[in-house]
């Protein structure tokens, strides 16, 4: 099981120990997809303080860790899922909508669900007519949102970059990288 992985070698940031550190704002090795999303906010100098974000996902891989990372940046966070009532209304109130459903047959984020100028981060991946697509109707949302990530080519590469970053960090912690040993 994942709990058998040493927390200082946990480059995915998903061991119970690292998840616990994340929930207290002290994690060093953080889950890659949420970290990649936060890195995008930093790169584009998006001030998150006081913003309202809706995360459409409650998984241990994306939704829950992302909730904690956004809280660290003083974001008001609403977590939505398959049982959430009035999802459209929640999304329409949000400055940031992050969707990670990953099943286009069950959910598509459409432009009428997003307020003008919102930021849309699409983590979902589905196959449609032999193409990879996200949860968001990209073309219509692009006309309404201030930012929207594409699928493929948006969050996915950032996830890989954060995995590499965590690998270097773990190697440094374990004194196996650049220490001459």
Regions found by a protein language model. Name each.
Residues 27-119, 128-142:
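Glycine-rich phosphate/diphosphate-binding loop of Rossmann-like nucleotide-binding domains
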Residues 1-22, 121-177:
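Rossmann-fold NAD(P)-binding glycine/threonine-rich loop
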